[in-house]
């Protein structure tokens, strides 16, 4: 009876341990897979520095263009679309984390004026939902609803990203005004070259950390290389580790200098930022403008009618 209880206890403990292990694995994998779009969120309170530079450029070193399109003016409490285009050659392949080649992903950050935010689902029209597709946007911070991030998402499908935006109503939001506002955007295609902790990814150039002669190049079992460099002056040996992905440019016996590239640059992507302006238009001002135009048109019509009437009178007097 005691052995049976012991067996049951051991079985229960093993089941609990396995369950905990599975939970830890799932949580770990989820955080790793989701880490990319929130790298900036984890390290920076605001994605736009005082200089105007968006912090994503700290990891994506290459510069590439982006294009942002928004309406010239919008009315209060109105849903409109901000369209971000991230152009690149769809035939390009990037180096993945495991060293293999794959398609490029894209990501973006949209910095809206205070009061502007992501439109709620019940305010988005079916036509706009079709343009958005399966994209899922999130706020940069819970208290920064005007800053939106997206990505990584497949570049072939989402090189054009449509953000559904809701404009504020100054009648209900005291910090909103009928003014012209700037909108800032940053977009990247492909993986970054530097991680937030400052370490290099495998999507960049690796340089020699010492001057000397390449004594040995060891190809690692899981990919990548270990390059042994011996300094001819003092015999000191340095080992530079190259992750899988970049292609070697040096060979054994070759003399190299400090900071000389050991690999090619595999990066085919890059980051770009842009800006646009939008006017939060006062409906009363629009109505006043329409009334003015209508008044001008009516005045012109009456003027034409009066002129024709005058011409008829003149013609009558001449005939008389």
UniProtKB/Swiss-Prot annotation:
What cofactors does this protein use? heme
As for membrane topology, the entry says: Single-pass membrane protein
Residues bound to heme are 36, 56, 59-60
Q: Name the SUPFAM superfamilies for this protein.
A: Cytochrome f subunit of the cytochrome b6f complex, transmembrane anchor (SSF103431), Cytochrome f, large domain (SSF49441), Rudiment single hybrid motif (SSF51246)
Keyword check for Membrane, yes or no. yes
**TM annotation in the entry:** 286-306
Copy out the cofactor comment: Binds 1 heme group covalently.
Q: From which domain of life does this come?
A: Eukaryota
The Gene Ontology terms for molecular function here are: electron transfer activity; heme binding; iron ion binding
The record's subcellular location field reads: Plastid, Chloroplast thylakoid membrane
Q: Which GO terms describe its biological process?
A: photosynthesis
**Keywords of the record:** Chloroplast, Electron transport, Heme, Iron, Membrane, Metal-binding, Photosynthesis, Plastid, Signal, Thylakoid, Transmembrane, Transmembrane helix, Transport
Using the record, list the residue span of the signal peptide; answer none if the entry has no such feature. 1-35
Record-level GO cellular component terms? chloroplast thylakoid membrane
Q: Which InterPro entries match?
A: Cyt-f_TM (IPR024058), Cyt_f (IPR002325), Cyt_f_lg_dom (IPR024094), Cyt_f_lg_dom_sf (IPR036826), Rudment_hybrid_motif (IPR011054)
Q: Which Pfam families match?
A: Apocytochr_F_C, Apocytochr_F_N
* Purpose of the protein: Component of the cytochrome b6-f complex, which mediates electron transfer between photosystem II (PSII) and photosystem I (PSI), cyclic electron flow around PSI, and state transitions.
Question: Quaternary structure?
Answer: The 4 large subunits of the cytochrome b6-f complex are cytochrome b6, subunit IV (17 kDa polypeptide, petD), cytochrome f and the Rieske protein, while the 4 small subunits are PetG, PetL, PetM and PetN. The complex functions as a dimer.
Which family is this protein grouped under? Belongs to the cytochrome f family.
Record PANTHER family: CYTOCHROME F (PTHR33288:SF10), PTHR33288
Q: Any idea what this protein is called?
A: Cytochrome f
Q: What is the lineage of its organism?
A: Eukaryota, Viridiplantae, Streptophyta, Embryophyta, Tracheophyta
Gene name of the encoded protein: petA
